[in-house]
Curated annotation (Swiss-Prot):
Binding site for Mg(2+): 408, 410, 770, 774
E.C. number(s) listed in UniProt: 7.6.2.1
Protein name per its UniProtKB record: Phospholipid-transporting ATPase neo1
Enzyme class: translocase
Pfam families named in the record: Cation_ATPase, E1-E2_ATPase, PhoLip_ATPase_C, PhoLip_ATPase_N
Record's catalysed reaction(s): ATP + H2O + phospholipidSide 1 = ADP + phosphate + phospholipidSide 2; a 1,2-diacyl-sn-glycero-3-phospho-L-serine(out) + ATP + H2O = a 1,2-diacyl-sn-glycero-3-phospho-L-serine(in) + ADP + phosphate + H(+); a 1,2-diacyl-sn-glycero-3-phosphoethanolamine(out) + ATP + H2O = a 1,2-diacyl-sn-glycero-3-phosphoethanolamine(in) + ADP + phosphate + H(+)
Function: Flippase that catalyzes the hydrolysis of ATP coupled to the transport of lysophosphatidylserine, phosphatidylethanolamine, and phosphatidylserine from the lumenal to the cytosolic leaflet of the Golgi apparatus membrane and ensures the maintenance of asymmetric distribution of phospholipids.
Localisation: Endosome membrane; Golgi apparatus membrane
Length: 1033
């Protein structure tokens, strides 16, 4: 064995030299490790599984090549015995929950005490256990903190229970495993699973056997975003025995390396034999053996771990809380030392810190959490958003701060339903309304529009070519209804269309196609490849004529057909309509011509060199792909979701950059970008595809810099190239474009691009998708929106918001997002204002009290001020509306204006602080001046009453629309205060409250306190009104 290993290492060295690899030691280590692993596997399993031959050496080479290309690949093979469960690889349970029974409390408490103001109040509360620092009652400080934590813990528990229920639904889906029913979560590696048609594949499997035919199709749009169905080949013709050697789990959905051994005969298996988890079987039932489960599946490895999202507003409030705390600390030290240095000065500092703790209000957390709940419930109860589900109530205000929307294409912007829309033959064009003319040509009866025989022949030839040049297989269901299976929905749409014209595909085998009762022999078939952008077939008709048919992208096909004056122009017309265009051509072959081609092609296919595919393509090009007869063009429409065009226009007008990230081909994405109006009419489209050098990338970016209004279409590999070499320049230029389309984009690339925008642009990003391949970016985004898809609910379950269709996004952002951000910001400002106001009064009282840290308000007054006396009016702000729904959608620019001005900005914060300081000084100083310092009962009655009424009037001055809830909260609070006064005899002098002096003093103080605020507001509306204020007029 060692001699064979040395021989293979020698070959590896030659291969390394050929590949110009920079680190030749890696593949030898990989080979040694894999050889040892395989040898141990052979001994432990009692099978002579590994005699390292050429195929295995190439497999190991490919493994390193994949690793060198950036695929994280461990070459330790896992051995799977068909039908023998392997519990050591773990179960197949899906989990999106954040907590379990043991981690809930510590994790939640950690999340809460990450907020500075919560930690601050915890320390303040604990300080009351130290006798020298005790001020008033312990419950005055500890009760609000406990209340805040209980509200938050309850909300988190409810949200996580909902996630657990959703996971339970997916985990308990029943499958037939080893001929017995089994829940999806209990499936293990080694199990043989039967998958029925249209059933979701629960784990990564190797296809063993098909029940009908010898091939299967899967839909992968929920995994990689590609709309084309994928052909899969069984590696056996039975499902009861065999051994699979598979490489370690990797992220790449396009690579797989392994072998399948049956009766001591070993054969290589590749990605063509795989059934990845979360894809859907599109053909008849199959049997597969499970290789990877749970977190080891491609789907899970391409998904980001769920994290607790924190809104930007929360971070801003946390920052300003630290500023206020610093101010409190400086103020406390200043007041302590302003009256001389005492031996116990530190106790005075701490007592001042506790007295002024209201500056950082503990109930800010409660108010914000309750506001989030209210906004979330309003969203869910919106009759214009049927089926919307708020899965995370932590970030409703983030909906109002979105700068970038990154959206998937398949199932999000489109319905993934293809429809034949246009046909172009020579100078004749046929739309959907005039297809009866085409049908008349096919069925040889008189056409509604007179056509010459030559024209009719051209139409027949084109339709016949479309009926034959495809990979579609008909399948009859149990109900007798015929369905079509293919690797491309375009082909299915075209075949369905030709069947309506009378050319019905009734049967297909590997060797023949049957149209009605006519059998056409398949001599050769050349499958579609993204690199070649075309698909061809050679058939022999019932009358022995041999014809080569070819269809593909216009950019490629124009090189193969005879010169045409109309081809380029008509292709451009169809593309501008957003249709997926195919050029169709044919070439008649004599028996001698076909024989010569067949011999040359066969010789090329037997080549063992790495250039075998290239040689075969050269033969096809030399013998077939030249001087072909142009038959015509087809235009297929990928139907858009409802109101997609309107929604995208609204988002753009709101100043939001819209990007489309898709796993689909460049041509397909380009068509959808045009048809959805993501690209405006006449807008310049710049395409970057298959970049190979830094100079080329730099030139592309230079072009884009000079054309900021253009749309960029770029493939995933080119994007990775730009990020790797020119990251800052790439992000700076691309982020300013009006629209960007990224094609051939993997789930990991989607998530990475989201992170880049967040980090480099410090912008809020909203990601929208409907498939499992979108989960990663949805979890990374500031706000993730999942659309309930036809193929599953993975994106919907992982998202913060779940909606039924893409058109709901505009309402979610422009209406609910704007309200949430604006009103929550205003609420936070008022809570801070309320805390500062009472703290300023306390500062004035301490100064007048010879700088002693004595409490002005204690007990019920201190607790009641921020709860039953002011909480309802202040909280009612969340129900205010500055403009109507109609105006928001008529003027989406309001969204952009609000986001750019920032509701919770330095300017607004400083304004809030100055107003609070001014009003606090006026209330406390004028109370002392007009009432006196000695009569504490009278002084407290006036001062506290002015604080309450000042807050009620301040709220009233800020209200734009007097909703019933707001009016009731003001009146109810006023009544509660009046009715509670008789119970405040320990603090107030009740006889004074009944006298005239109390009323005129209070009225005078309130007038002086509120007059500047009212005047400032009136002047601003007059001289520099905001856009919404103008609309209110």
């Amino acid at each position: 064995m060692d001699s064979r290993l040395n021989r293979i290492q020698s070959k590896m060295k030659l291969w390394i030299k050929d590949k110009n690899l920079s680190n030749p030691s890696i593949p030898l280590k990989v080979l040694n490790k894999s050889f040892r692993s395989s040898r141990q596997s052979s001994v432990s399993n009692g099978h002579g599984l590994y005699s390292l031959d050429r195929d295995e050496t190439e497999s190991l080479m490919s493994s390193h090549e994949a690793s060198n290309a950036g695929i994280s690949l461990d070459s330790s093979f896992r051995v799977i015995q068909v039908g023998q469960p392997e519990p050591q690889y773990g179960n197949n349970a899906v989990t999106n929950t954040k907590y379990d029974l043991f981690t809930f409390l510590p994790k939640c408490l950690y999340e809460q005490f990450r907020y500075f103001y919560n930690m601050y109040f915890l320390l303040v509360s604990l300080s009351q256990l130290i006798p020298p620092l005790k001020i008033g009652y312990l419950s005055t400080y500890i009760a609000p903190l406990i209340f805040v934590l209980l509200i938050t813990l309850t909300k988190e528990a409810v949200d996580d229970l909902k996630r657990r229920r959703r996971d339970s639904y997916a985990n308990n889906e029943i499958y037939t495993v080893n001929d017995s029913p089994c829940a999806a979560q209990n499936i293990q590696a080694g199990d043989v699973v039967y998958i029925a048609k249209d059933q979701r594949i629960p784990a990564d499997m190797i296809l063993l056997e098909t029940t009908v035919g010898n091939e299967a199709f899967i839909r992968t749009d929920q995994l990689d975003g590609e709309t084309d169905w994928k052909l899969r080949i069984p590696c056996s013709n039975q499902h009861t025995e065999g051994i699979v050697h598979a490489d370690a789990p990797i992220k790449s959905v396009h690579h797989f390396y392994g072998t399948f051994t049956l009766n001591n005969q070993k054969r290589p298996i590749s990605v063509d034999h795989t059934l990845w988890a979360n894809t859907v079987l599109a053909s008849d039932g199959v049997y597969g053996v499970v290789v990877y489960t749970g977190k080891d599946t491609r789907q899970s490895m391409n998904s980001s771990k769920a994290k607790t999202k924190v809104g930007l507003l929360e971070k801003e409030i946390n920052f300003y809380s630290k500023i206020l705390c610093t101010f409190v600390l400086v103020l406390s030290i200043g007041l302590t030392f302003s009256h001389g240095i005492k031996t116990d000065w530190y106790i005075s500092v701490f007592r001042y810190l506790i007295l002024f703790s209201s500056i950082i209000p503990i109930n800010l957390r409660v108010n914000l959490d309750l506001a989030k709940i209210v906004h979330s419930k309003n969203t869910e109860s919106d009759p214009n958003l049927p089926g919307v589900v708020v899965r995370s109530s932590n970030i409703p205000e983030e909906l109002g701060r979105i700068e970038y929307v990154l959206t998937d294409k398949t199932g999000t912007l489109t319905q993934n339903e293809m429809e034949m829309k246009k046909l172009h033959v020579g100078t004749m064009g046929f739309s959907a309304e005039s297809m009866d003319v085409v049908q008349a040509c096919i069925q040889n009866y008189s056409t509604p529009i007179p056509l010459s025989e030559d024209s009719k022949t051209l139409v027949r030839n084109l339709v016949l070519a479309l009926s034959l040049c495809h990979n579609v297989t008909p399948s009859k269901g149990h109900d007798g209804v015929v369905s079509y299976q293919a690797a491309s929905p375009d082909e299915v749409a075209i075949v369905k269309w030709t069947s309506t014209l009378g050319l019905v595909l009734t049967n297909r085998t590997r060797d023949a196609i049957t149209l009605n009762n006519n059998v056409y022999k398949i001599l050769n078939i050349f499958p579609f490849k993204s690199e070649t952008k075309r698909m061809g077939i050679i058939v022999q008709s019932p009358d022995e004529k041999i014809t080569f048919y070819l269809k593909g992208a216009d950019s490629i096909m124009q090189n193969f057909v005879k010169p045409s004056f109309w081809l380029e122009e008509e292709c451009g017309n169809l593309a501008r309509e957003g249709l997926r265009t195919l050029v169709v051509a044919k070439k008649d072959l004599s028996a001698e011509e076909y024989s010569a081609f067949s011999l040359a092609h066969s010789d090329a296919s037997l080549s063992f060199s790495n250039s075998r595919d290239k040689k075969m393509e050269e033969i096809v090009s030399r013998y077939l792909e030249n001087d072909m007869d142009l038959l015509g063009l087809t235009g297929v429409e990928d139907k858009l979701q409802k109101d997609v065009k309107i929604t995208l226009e609204l988002l753009r007008n709101a100043g939001i950059h819209v990007w489309m990230l898709t796993g689909d081909k460049v041509e397909t994405a380009r068509c959808i970008a045009i048809s959805s109006r993501l690209v405006s009419r006449g807008q310049y489209i710049h395409t970057i595809n298959q970049l190979s050098s830094r100079e080329e990338a730099h030139n592309h970016l230079l072009t884009l810099r000079n054309k900021p209004d253009s749309c960029l279409i770029i493939d995933g590999e080119s994007m990775e190239f730009c990020i790797g070499y020119l990251q800052n320049e790439f992000i700076d230029i691309v982020s300013d474009l009006s629209s960007v389309v990224i094609c051939r984009c993997t789930p990991t690339q989607k998530a990475n691009m989201t992170r880049l925008i967040q980090e480099k642009k410090q912008a809020s990003v909203c990601c929208i998708g409907d498939g499992g391949n979108d989960v990663g970016m949805i979890q990374v985004a500031n706000v993730g929106i999942g659309i309930v898809g036809k193929e599953g609910q993975q994106a919907s379950l992982a998202a913060d918001y779940s909606v039924k269709e893409f058109s709901h996004v505009s309402r979610l952002l422009l209406w609910h997002g704007r309200i949430s951000y604006k009103q929550t910001s205003k609420l936070a400002m008022f809570v801070i204002h309320r805390g500062l106001l009472i703290s300023v009064c306390q500062v004035v009282y301490s100064v007048i009290s010879a700088f002693e840290p004595i409490a002005l308000f204690q007990g019920l007054l201190l607790v009641g001020y921020s709860t039953m006396y002011t909480m309802l009016p202040v909280f009612s702000i969340v129900y205010d509306r500055d403009v109507s729904e109609k105006l928001v959608f008529l003027f989406p620019e309001l969204y952009k204006e609000m986001r750019e001005q920032k509701c919770f900005s330095y300017k607004n914060f400083i304004s809030c602080v100055l107003i609070s300081v001014y009003q606090g000084l006026i209330i406390q100083l004028f109370t002392f001046y007009l009432i006196g310092f000695e009569e504490e009962g009278k002084m407290l009655a006036v001062c506290f009453s002015c604080l309450i009424f000042n807050e009620l009037i301040m709220v009233a001055l800020q209200i734009n629309t007097w909703e019933q809830t707001i009016v009731m909260s003001e009146l109810l609070t006023l009544m509660m205060y009046i009715l509670s006064v008789p119970f405040l005899t320990n603090y107030f002098e009740l006889k004074f409250l009944l006298g005239l002096k109390f009323y005129w003093v209070s009225a005078l103080i309130l007038f002086i306190s509120l007059l500047p605020v009212w005047c400032g507001k009136a002047l601003k509306r007059k001289l520099k009104p905001s856009s919404y204020a103008k609309l209110q007029r």
